[in-house]
From Swiss-Prot:
Its EC number is 5.4.3.8. Keywords: Cytoplasm, Isomerase, Porphyrin biosynthesis, Pyridoxal phosphate. Pathway: Porphyrin-containing compound metabolism; protoporphyrin-IX biosynthesis; 5-aminolevulinate from L-glutamyl-tRNA(Glu): step 2/2. The modification N6-(pyridoxal phosphate)lysine is found at residue 267. This is Glutamate-1-semialdehyde 2,1-aminomutase 1. It holds the Pfam family Aminotran_3. It is found in: Cytoplasm.
Amino acid sequence: MRYTKSEEAMKVAETLMPGGVNSPVRAFKSVDTPAIFMDHGKGSKIYDIDGNEYIDYVLSWGPLILGHRDPQVISHLHEAIDKGTSFGASTLLENKLAQLVIDRVPSIEKVRMVSSGTEATLDTLRLARGYTGRNKIVKFEGCYHGHSDSLLIKAGSGVATLGLPDSPGVPEGIAKNTITVPYNDLDALKIAFEKFGDDIAGVIVEPVAGNMGVIPPIEGFLQGLRDITTEYGALLIFDEVMTGFRVGYHCAQGYFGVTPDLTCLGKVIGGGLPVGAFGGKKEIMDQIAPLGNIYQAGTLSGNPLAMTSGYETLSQLAPETYEYFNMLGDILEDGLKRVFAKHNVPITVNRAGSMIGYFLNEGPVTNFEQANKSDLKLFAEMYREMAKEGVFLPPSQFEGTFLSTAHTKEDIEKTIQAFDTALSRIVK
């Protein structure tokens, strides 16, 4: 494949934007390949400005659960935009999407719409602290909850130590109110609560970690979080920005049967437009302004375009949708294991609904430390060879791949064949 136009576009972009991009992963640095500039998408396919076609497993990093340019979503967006883009006042569309979210998400009795997943997690932590009167938050290593200061935190030097800034610009005073423990490790969480329990406002977790590859919870982990937070009077917060409506019809909490106090949403609920949301029990949500004293606001929160795209996306999802995802996922997982075994290359495949992650190691992979043992050099080679075969994968080992309703068995079979061809070139 040729990337002449993308390379030229990137040279211009680098003079205009830091690194030439508006989000770091789009620079493709970890796979040592030129950034690709996209032109359009249709169904399960995406097309770059050089005219190359790919089967798309990035799907705008998760939101496009119906694939690109779904006819129903696009048609209703045209109708909405003809009425205006934003009004600074409420619309009936907000009621429609809010009701649908409340009906499907077990933990949500009331919901507040925002404009991004980062806003959702940031506002949820403020709400948790305001509601409990406590300061500290527990997060898990490898889980990403957006780029707010209190969540860009890495672990300290030992189990359940106070956090350290993970980015320049994050004050130590903020970092010290974030406790980081290993994912899937209830013993570490218990130690954290034994040391700081009286001042822990909440525990925030991706119920399926999707930002260190895809790592599902081990059996009993989520229920353990529920039990421990309840015991200490802290709030359990599920960050379902990625897993929401991807893992199951009732989100990850419905799939695993564990109900948090608060839930953060994003990605799928906007159908490709900027959106986020957070919700939970009425008694907690009613502490937010204008009913309560905990402040939250947003100029474009609940804007009619995002509400339209979100509603028309979610309204097309049904329990049968997830049966289809499981069928495609089974074929892809079996094919990956078969092809990698054929070439004597170790692989660990993790799945949850329409989220799939593969690690180039023996496994198992249940936490960030194990994820880091994946062969990153081989992953980069694999990415480059798969792009040549017309398959667009996330350009990072630590991002998940996604399926959409637009993907077909033929797409999956072509992808498996592409892996076989790529490995044939890589493994001598």
